[in-house]
A protein has these predicted regions:
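Short glycine/proline/serine/threonine-rich loop/turn segments at secondary-structure transition edges
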Residues: 3, 16-27
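Asp-box/BNR beta-propeller blade signature and adjacent active/binding-site loops
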Residues: 4, 8, 13, 41-407
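Beta-strand-rich extracellular modules
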Residues: 13-15, 31
Length: 407
């Protein structure tokens, strides 16, 4: 201690056996110095706090950083978290990057050792750092329990940023490649990469890649991933790609809104898809809907007004009334709830199709700065899970009761 004002922080570490659903509050009612009462100015809040698991930290498995979370729950109830393994630094492609998977069979309480789902090593005689693959999105085919991961593979590019160095064309020597892997054993092992670039990319586009996070299975069995592409004028645009034959062939139609990038997709009614998009204009999320798998798009009334953002990736899932404890159709959304910085990671729930997101239906998880990306998945009918880039771990997992979110 020093003379004058002294600052202290309270830090709580959970026991390994503590339930992820544990909540607590912290206060400091008194303090003593040399057995004498000391004056306290309490700058903290007595908000409810929640337990969490740091699934990936800097330095784990020899990697400098882990970024870009995706999360799904398989038909068997297994949680699969995906992310970039950024071996050398936290920077984006092009770099030495593979796709990692963390797997939990006990609702996120514990996680198995990391698996590598996609790597290109020294393909084409170039070093690993010239064969990065990243920004994963993961999808469960709910009809078959086949799990798909889509990611962008970049070959060459001299360690320049792929966003600016991927060029028009179709070959790996000129442009980023859109790659799939699949698992048919609940995420334990993964296939060799499948290149679908020729199925969905326009040769005039500079860059085609997925919207990181997750995709969905529609009620009619159609598989859908969000995508983004930099067109021939170098403007980025968000949209979707889909498969009607269990992932064998993929199709892509039109952009949902220009000058948008990372997006997430949800089926809000049978056959109706909502795309929630990161918008380079800043300030708030763009939202559009389609009834024909992206041939035509309609701006949603909530677009550019209902959900603030600092220009960052976000997550959106739809949960049918029959599939959750509230008995209501839910849209669940997460992002940094701010227009500046990437802080205040918040989960919000809408019960009116995304028109409104009441304050009473919001829970803030992390007020401090981080990279800010997140992905949601229902754990069971009562609980939603979030896998996100927090201020304390590169990949953090938390579980929140729906009854804490829906008032």
């Amino acid at each position: 201690m020093v003379e004058g004002v002294n600052y202290y922080w309270i830090s709580i570490e959970m026991k390994p056996e503590a339930s992820l659903l544990t909540t607590f509050t912290v206060q400091m009612p008194m303090a003593e110095v040399n057995n004498m009462p000391a004056t306290i100015v309490w700058d903290g809040k007595s908000d409810v706090r929640r337990m969490g698991i740091g699934v990936r930290h800097a330095g784990d498995d020899g990697a400098a950083a882990f970024r870009i979370p995706g999360l799904v729950t398989t038909n068997n109830g297994t949680l699969l978290g995906v992310y970039d393994i950024r071996y050398n630094s936290s920077v984006d492609l092009q770099e030495m990057v593979d796709i990692g998977v963390s797997r939990s069979t006990d609702k996120g309480q514990t996680w198995e050792p990391m698996r590598v789902a996609m790597t290109f090593g020294e393909t084409g005689g170039l070093p690993h750092s010239q064969n990065g693959v990243g920004d994963p999105s993961i999808l469960v085919d709910e009809k078959t329990n086949t799990i798909w991961i889509v990611a962008a593979w970049t070959h060459g590019m001299g360690n320049g940023r792929a966003w600016w160095n991927s060029m028009p064309g179709m070959s790996a020597d000129s442009t980023a490649q859109l790659m799939l892997v699949k698992s048919e054993d609940d995420g334990k092992t993964w296939s060799q990469p499948i290149n679908i670039t020729s199925q969905v990319k326009d040769p005039s586009w500079y860059f085609l890649l997925q919207g990181p996070g997750r995709g969905i299975t529609m009620k009619d069995g159609t598989l859908v991933f969000p995508i983004q592409f930099i067109d021939s004028t170098r403007i980025p645009n968000a949209g979707i790609m889909y498969s009607k034959d269990r992932g064998t062939t993929w199709h892509l139609h039109n952009l949902a809104r220009t000058n948008t990038t990372e997006a997430q997709v949800a089926e809000v009614e049978p056959g109706v898809l909502m795309l929630n998009m990161r918008d380079n204009r800043g300030g708030s999320r763009a939202v559009a809907t389609t009834r024909d798998l992206g041939k035509t798009w309609y701006e949603h009334p909530s677009s550019r007004s209902a959900l603030q953002e600092p220009v960052c990736m976000a997550s959106l899932i739809h949960v049918d009334a029959k599939d959750n404890i509230t008995g209501k159709d839910l849209l669940i959304f997460s992002n940094p709830n701010t227009t500046k910085g990437r802080n205040h990671i918040t989960i919000k729930v809408s019960t009116d199709g995304g028109m409104t997101w009441p304050l009473s239906n919001q829970v803030t998880l992390d007020e401090d700065e981080g990279w800010g990306y997140s992905c949601l998945s229902m754990i069971d009918k009562e609980t939603v899970g979030i896998f996100y880039e927090s201020s304390v771990a590169h990949m953090t997992f938390q579980a929140i009761r729906l009854t804490d979110l829906v008032k």
